[in-house]
A protein has these predicted regions:
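A beta-rich soluble binding module of mature secreted/lumenal proteins
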Residues: 15, 20-168
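Bacterial N-terminal signal peptides that target proteins for export
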Residues: 1-11
Length: 168
């Protein structure tokens, strides 16, 4: 066996072991819970992004919004928009479709912006009047606080951040 093949084999085995271990669930963090029910018709419409966990696909975005509309097919059209690097920046838009993944609660969706990749969209907190929502995904890598209005009062935002901390 050549040295290259030997080292490549060790490298490949190490990658397999590391990736296998990374998929083992963390027992210390409880499973993320979604809200008990979402009336999709009330959830549709425009939402403003108030806060988020930073992510690569919104880098440089300012004034982000999400617009949800129901299509005849039953899918939900998702239109995300932001201005790049400030309020007068170039408009950036991403359009995708979402399917309800849990018909019991309507709180778990699968969103697809480009084929074949789909992402989880879990509604983990929702105002009874549908004025704000917290959205995340099972691994807690992404999170957004959304509001029906462009601004949120400081106390409500503080309360929502505390809810997020309590959810782990």
């Amino acid at each position: 066996m050549t040295i290259f093949v030997k080292y490549f084999s060790y490298f490949f085995l190490t990658i397999l072991l590391v990736s296998g271990c990374s998929s083992i669930p963390n027992k210390a963090t409880p499973e993320l819970q979604v809200v008990s029910y979402v009336d999709i018709e009330r959830y549709l419409g425009k939402w403003y992004e108030i806060a988020l966990y930073p992510n690569w696909f919104e880098k440089g975005c300012f004034g982000s919004t999400a617009y949800y509309e129901k299509l005849e097919s039953g899918q939900i059209r998702v239109t995300n928009q932001c201005r790049m690097h400030g309020p007068e920046g170039e408009l950036n838009e991403a359009i995708g479709n979402a399917d309800i993944a849990d018909n019991k609660t309507n709180a778990k969706l699968k969103v697809q912006f480009f084929w074949p990749f789909k992402g989880d969209y879990w509604i983990i907190d929702l105002d009874k009047d549908y004025q704000y929502a917290i959205v995340s995904e099972p691994d807690r890598q992404y999170l957004w606080i959304l509001s029906r209005s462009q601004n949120m009062d400081v106390q409500t935002l503080k309360t929502l951040k505390e809810k997020i901390r309590n959810k782990g």
